[in-house]
């Protein structure tokens, strides 16, 4: 298969509405794939005034404000409704990339499996550690189990560093985890 044969449906909990490292990496990935001839369609929550313009086609996902005190800038995608499923059917992806194990990521995984489409998951953050910051560390074992259930159902898993891969392997998140290093933007960091 040539890169120009790829039809990628990318699901992201935050593609461009709030700037962070994960969505910067995803936007660069989409830009690179598009430049090489791949077809990419991004599915993520949309807001009226995003922090930056999205790279590629962006389809809005149903969402609600993040139900965590102090994180009102983030949205929680609630799944993929009928309109998104129709859009997926029309786009006809041959790979689904899920960048967040949120409700839309779970729904995208189920949809892809129902359509015999391979699923790549990328890990961008240590979600299992989040409860520590809200005095709910007791939830960490449950979150690890939920993440493991999600990631082991994916066909491939990638992480940004060897240390992250080692952590994910130790938690049994997937048997084979690839390295997706982001590199350094030489237009910003140069000698």
Identify the role of each PLM range.
Residues 44, 60, 144-191:
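Donor nucleotide-sugar binding/catalytic pocket of nucleotide-sugar-dependent glycosyltransferases
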Residues 96-123, 128:
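An aromatic- and histidine-rich active-site surface loop
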Residues 1-62:
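N-terminal subdomain of nucleotide-sugar transferases
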Residues 87-89, 149-150:
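Structural alpha-helical scaffold elements that stabilize or flank donor/cofactor-binding regions
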Residues 48, 103-104, 163-165:
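Alpha-helix capping/helix-boundary segments
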Residues 36, 91, 111-115:
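Helix C-cap/helix->beta junction micro-motif
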Residues 118-120, 129-149, 159, 186:
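Nucleotide-sugar donor phosphate/pyrophosphate-binding loop at the beta->alpha transition
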Residues 56-86:
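A short, charged, and often flexible helix/loop element on the N-terminal side
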